[in-house]
């Protein structure tokens, strides 16, 4: 069951940057461990985008770079299923009005800027 608290961050008891409900979802998947790591990176990065100070241009640009890397990582680990997986990351993370508004603020702040695709597969691990 997805967390729908008014809190944008949501619970993260283990402090890995991924909401606990999404961590449980990832753990329940039959995917490979490298694929699960890619999903965790995607969920962590998107959660961070919702929480960053959108008045800080450096933070926004860093967020854009991290987002591009996490998407590239998912594509490198999932191949033809990557588009579906990337869509799930967004759908499951931005699942309340408060989170949607935070995501809209980030996207508005990022508008007009460009990000460079990462070197390699974009994966943290």
Model-identified regions with their sequence ranges:
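Calcium-binding acidic motifs and repeat modules
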Residues: 1-15, 21-125
């Amino acid at each position: 069951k997805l967390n729908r608290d008014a809190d944008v961050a949501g619970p993260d008891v283990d402090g890995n940057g991924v909401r606990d409900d999404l961590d449980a979802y990832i753990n329940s998947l039959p995917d490979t461990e490298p694929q699960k790591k890619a999903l965790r990176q995607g969920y962590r990065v998107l959660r961070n985008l919702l929480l960053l100070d959108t008045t800080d241009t450096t933070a926004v640009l860093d967020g854009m770079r991290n987002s591009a890397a996490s998407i590239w990582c998912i594509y490198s680990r999932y191949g033809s299923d990557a588009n579906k997986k990337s869509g799930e990351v967004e759908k499951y993370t931005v699942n309340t009005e408060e989170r949607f508004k935070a995501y809209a603020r980030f996207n508005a702040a990022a508008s007009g800027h460009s990000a460079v695709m990462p070197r390699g597969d974009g994966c943290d691990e």
